[in-house]
Regions:
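Membrane-embedded alpha-helical bundles that constitute the cytochrome b-like, heme-associated redox core
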Residues: 1-137
Length: 137
């Protein structure tokens, strides 16, 4: 079960990141303030990161790198700490920021600015804590 969910988490991450990047680009390219295309991409990106979060939380509780590694000894190893603490915490914060950006954009007169700022910060946070050594192998 663990390898299957790990594969889903790894492959779906590409889709989630792509949708966030497309949302940011479509927001930048939006010239007409009344256009709704950037909002659609922002919504798809929002849904993708939330699905990725659910898959990731499932993986966290099934993984040998999850709750079992919250002891003092595992915190000394940078890779184990990345998987057990830094990756989940930072990604949850990034998803919260993306959610805030989408929700604020619905209330703002020019929502594209909110999406641009919050989605970009969220993307930077997501990319900063990807375990690149295992993800690309």
């Amino acid at each position: 079960m663990y390898p299957f969910i790990k594969s889903i988490h790894s492959y779906f991450a590409w889709a989630a990141l792509a949708l966030i990047i497309i949302a940011i680009i479509s927001t930048i390219l939006t010239k007409n303030k009344e256009s709704v295309s950037y909002k659609k991409w922002a919504f798809f990106g929002l849904m993708a990161v939330h699905i990725q979060l659910l898959i990731g939380l499932t993986l966290y509780f099934l993984s040998p790198f999850g709750l079992d590694n919250l002891s003092g000894d595992s915190m000394k190893d940078s890779f184990t700490r990345l998987l057990a603490v830094e990756h989940p915490f930072t990604n949850i914060v990034a998803i919260i920021l993306i959610t805030i950006g989408y929700s604020q954009s619905k209330k703002a007169e020019y929502g594209s600015k909110k999406i641009l700022v919050f989605y970009t910060i969220g993307l930077i946070l997501l990319l900063s804590r990807v375990p690149w050594s295992t993800w690309l192998s």
